[in-house]
A protein has these predicted regions:
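Long acidic, serine-enriched intrinsically disordered low-complexity regions
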Residues: 328-360
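Eukaryotic nuclear macromolecular-assembly scaffolds and interaction domains used across chromosome biology
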Residues: 1-339
């Protein structure tokens, strides 16, 4: 059947684009048929074409919103799997989440803050919080109580897909806010709404998150008042880093290392210490320690965000902080080891020459 799908897709893909441009509504109908109950959710991968992506690239904002609504319906009320088929439901739901992420990643699909925000709200509302009662207001169509309860595994999928989206979203939203900070605003709204949302974070994670949020709010207030452009850039970069740490900290268990302390301490020294000279020296070294610690954590998301911060602060790093970076990365040790090896080789060569002269 996969070969048949591939053959059919190859013959029709050249005709689909023009047809969808003439009638975007027909495009949505075609997508739902190709990826629905009688098709394949991973149609493009199975057929080795970009049929679905090509159709989606021809849709306007309204069409993309309808496509996302279709994917949410699959997640909230799976139809192609029986209620007792937990594995089938899980696969169907994860595939729909992957398609949402694919939409954000696609370079062919027209990006807009409207539908991108809806994707992030969905992943945030079900990954970092659980919807316990029907939501009212502008989020009511996006966040619903599922007919089959979400598993912890699906919530983990939502968290990882949201983080993957943020790696892709390098440009800010329509208000100029970095998307990671826009997600923080979403989570703050959910945290205050106890009637409809409950957090997925464990008590240890909640305590760490509150410490990080307190510093994040302090930094965002300072950023609004800051006049120096370089310092404002540094504040914004650090806000993004702190937001990223919060998103990963949501998953912390009792044995997880505390990522918050080192980042918060660095922020205090860099931005809120009264002694400017002390701030420059100690703050950059503490920042270096914090960033290296984050790079050691197995998280592609944190790695990506950490590298962004390195880039923002690179021009302001002092000689001491650069030397500290070399020490922390073990680069100096490697060079010393290489020097020792060279000296040993030279000494060995000298010994051999002396032995040869003695023999003569």
């Amino acid at each position: 059947p996969d070969r048949l799908l591939h053959s059919m897709a190859q013959k029709t893909v050249s005709l689909v684009g023009e047809a969808v441009k003439r009638s975007p509504t027909a495009g949505i109908a075609l997508v739902t048929q190709l990826t629905g109950e009688h098709g394949r959710q991973n149609f493009d991968r199975v057929t080795h074409t970009k049929t679905i992506e090509s159709i989606l690239s021809s849709l306007d904002e309204e069409g993309l919103q309808r496509y996302l609504a279709y994917l949410r319906d699959i997640i909230y009320a799976p139809t192609s799997a029986a209620p007792e088929d937990a594995k089938g439901i899980a696969m169907q739901r994860q595939s729909a989440c992957d398609q949402m992420l694919g939409l954000v990643r696609s370079h062919l699909v027209q990006s807009s803050s409207g539908w991108v925000r809806d994707v992030l709200i969905f992943f945030a509302g079900h990954g970092y919080y659980a919807v316990k009662n029907p939501v009212k207001g502008p989020w009511s169509a996006i966040l619903q109580v599922p007919t089959v309860p979400f598993t912890d595994a699906l919530r983990e999928v939502c968290r990882s897909r949201l983080q993957a989206c943020l790696i892709e979203l390098s440009e800010p939203d329509e208000r100029g806010t970095p998307w990671s900070l826009a997600v923080m605003d979403m989570l703050d709204t959910m945290e205050k709404d106890h009637k409809h949302f409950t957090t997925t974070a464990r008590p240890i994670a909640q305590e760490r998150i509150q410490r990080a949020k307190s510093m994040l709010h302090q930094m965002r207030n300072a950023s609004k008042k800051e006049k120096n452009e370089t310092r404002k850039l540094h504040l914004r970069a650090f806000e993004i880093l702190l937001a990223s740490v919060i998103l990963v900290t949501f998953e912390d268990g009792d044995d997880a290392p505390d990522m918050v302390d080192s980042v918060v301490d660095a922020a205090k020294l860099l931005f809120f210490d009264d002694k400017a000279s002390q701030r420059e020296m100690d703050g950059m070294e503490l920042l270096t320690d914090a960033l290296i610690g984050l790079l050691e954590i197995s998280s592609a998301f944190l790695r990506s965000m950490t590298i962004q911060v390195f880039s923002a602060f690179s021009s302001s790093m002092t000689r001491d902080s650069l030397n500290h970076l070399v020490d922390q990365l073990g680069m100096g040790e490697n060079e010393d080891a290489e020097d020792d090896e060279i000296k040993e080789d030279e000494e060995d060569d000298g010994d051999e020459e002396e032995e040869e002269e003695a023999d003569d």
